[in-house]
Design a protein with these regions (language model features):
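Short aromatic-enriched loop/helix-cap "lid" or pocket-rim segments at secondary-structure transitions
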Residues: 101, 146-151, 198-202, 231-232
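A short, conserved alpha-helix within the catalytic core of class I
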Residues: 116-130
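A short helix->loop->beta-strand "cap" motif at the edges of active sites that frequently abuts
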Residues: 62, 131-133
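Short alpha-helix
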Residues: 164-190
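Conserved class I S-adenosyl-L-methionine
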Residues: 136-160
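Conserved catalytic loop of SAM-dependent methyltransferase domains
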Residues: 185-221
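Conserved N-terminal segment of class I S-adenosyl-L-methionine
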Residues: 1-104, 212-221, 225-245
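A conserved beta-strand element that flanks and buttresses the S-adenosyl-L-methionine
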Residues: 109
Length: 245
């Protein structure tokens, strides 16, 4: 007989599935190619899950405030990094009451989080206010050209889904416009991670990934980024576009 606690995977089993491990690897592999100065920074990591992205910044000499809304995920983060003097772990719900007087950090890191929020505009504004230099953002998006966040239902019981049960699939236009309301220099990457959920051709009618998800990577900066890896405008189809598996 299966016990009630065995009916769903633990947070570690959920986040360490083959899909998640490959997805994380492709995203951080891509981040490392973008030419950003991410060494020896103070970093606010939001929606950290179980902390699988945290080591990327620790390996670069950063000090990280690792935040997450779910208690079960925070327990895993504390087990992993509790003895590391460069990691502070704290509870933060981006869909909850956000502290107006929170500290600022050189870099705010928000990968795979925005589309799990029911109030994405408020969260983006708050994160921009926390960023001294950069806000790094990766999120699921819609193919729409409308300036809309497009709210959707999600499974609140899942350790990686919207804690309120409501998420969003904003258009790239919406994300760029909200960031431009708070930050002077906003870009989308000229390249994409080598993964099927990151399309190169945005002229299609919808995602080619079997999950039905399409993703994009953005940065909001206090200073201009004169780098070939970033673009101030959308590319609807990258040169030499090929399918990522």
């Amino acid at each position: 007989m299966r016990l009630p606690g065995m009916l769903r995977p633990t947070a570690e089993r959920h986040f360490h599935s083959i899909f998640y491990l490959r997805h994380n690897a492709r995203r951080q592999e891509h981040l490392a190619t973008l030419g950003l100065d991410l060494g020896n920074k103070s970093v606010l990591e939001v929606g950290a899950g179980i902390g699988d992205h945290t080591q990327f910044f620790l390996d670069r000499g950063c000090k990280v405030l690792c935040t997450e809304p779910r208690g079960e995920n925070l327990d895993v983060i504390r087990q992993r990094f509790g003895s590391n003097p460069n990691v502070t772990v704290d509870h933060l719900d981006l869909d909850g009451d956000l502290p107006a007087e929170a500290h600022q950090y050189d870099v705010v890191y928000c990968y795979g989080v925005l589309y799990h929020l029911s109030r994405p505009a408020e969260a983006l504004a708050w994160m921009c206010d926390r960023a001294v230099d950069l806000l790094l953002l990766e999120t699921c998006v819609s193919y729409s050209g409308e300036d809309e966040p497009f709210l959707v239902s999600e499974r609140a019981s899942s350790p990686s889904q919207a804690i309120t049960g409501t998420g969003c699939r904003p258009s790239r236009v919406w994300v760029m416009n909200r960031l431009r309301e708070k930050m002077p220099h906003v870009y989308v990457t000229a390249t994409q991670p080598r993964h099927r959920q990151f399309p190169l051709d945005w002229r299609a009618n919808g995602p080619i990934a079997s999950t039905g998800l399409a993703r994009a990577v953005f940065v909001a900066s206090r200073a201009p980024l004169n780098l070939p890896t970033w673009s101030r405008s959308f590319r609807w189809c990258s040169a030499g576009a090929e399918a990522h598996m």
